[in-house]
């Protein structure tokens, strides 16, 4: 089983869409260990975007009511997120797509952050970067932290309108491989996810 951890440079960068694309492409299982906000969960979004019944969507280890930072959501509910209690699900040999909460330094409790969870799982990261003013800095800071922690990175997915100069300088500084460009879409559907899943393999094995 291969484990890919989907993280991003910020919140609302496109992690769930990219997770759906990867789950589709690899016929993998999906897991969101820590969900903050229960009105529209990422697991339910993934369910609506997959054609195949091959993938299992595993239940969250922590499902917190408020859509705020996980440490705050847990604290407000009188819960403590304990990393040792978050165990990888049994995928019966399937690859596993793990979707993080926010970015790599989002706190899970008073001492642990998302990056500690990545290390615990010994997962390979796929970084999602949506391009906006300031995103170069956010992307390079994320890459620097991943490198400092010796976390393996499979590659980067750029999400949103193309910005060739921003992409060039990010790749120059990080040495990352571009796995996929995701364009703005009027509506995200199963068909859109499937189309990107096919495109993913253009760069996946290089």
UniProtKB/Swiss-Prot annotation:
It holds the Pfam family AAA_26. ATP binds at residues 12-17, 99-102. InterPro entries: DTB_synth_BioD, P-loop_NTPase. It catalyses: (7R,8S)-7,8-diammoniononanoate + CO2 + ATP = (4R,5S)-dethiobiotin + ADP + phosphate + 3 H(+). Its cofactor is Mg(2+). GO terms for molecular function: ATP binding; dethiobiotin synthase activity; magnesium ion binding. It is an enzyme of class 6 (ligase). Mg(2+) binds at residues 16, 99. GO terms for cellular component: cytosol. Keywords: ATP-binding, Biotin biosynthesis, Cytoplasm, Ligase, Magnesium, Metal-binding, Nucleotide-binding. It is found in: Cytoplasm. Pathway: Cofactor biosynthesis; biotin biosynthesis; biotin from 7,8-diaminononanoate: step 1/2. Its EC number is 6.3.3.3. The active site is at 32. GO terms for biological process: biotin biosynthetic process. Belongs to the dethiobiotin synthetase family. NCBIfam families: bioD. Catalyzes a mechanistically unusual reaction, the ATP-dependent insertion of CO2 between the N7 and N8 nitrogen atoms of 7,8-diaminopelargonic acid (DAPA, also called 7,8-diammoniononanoate) to form a ureido ring. Homodimer. This is ATP-dependent dethiobiotin synthetase BioD. It comes from Cytophaga hutchinsonii (strain ATCC 33406 / DSM 1761 / CIP 103989 / NBRC 15051 / NCIMB 9469 / D465). The gene is bioD.
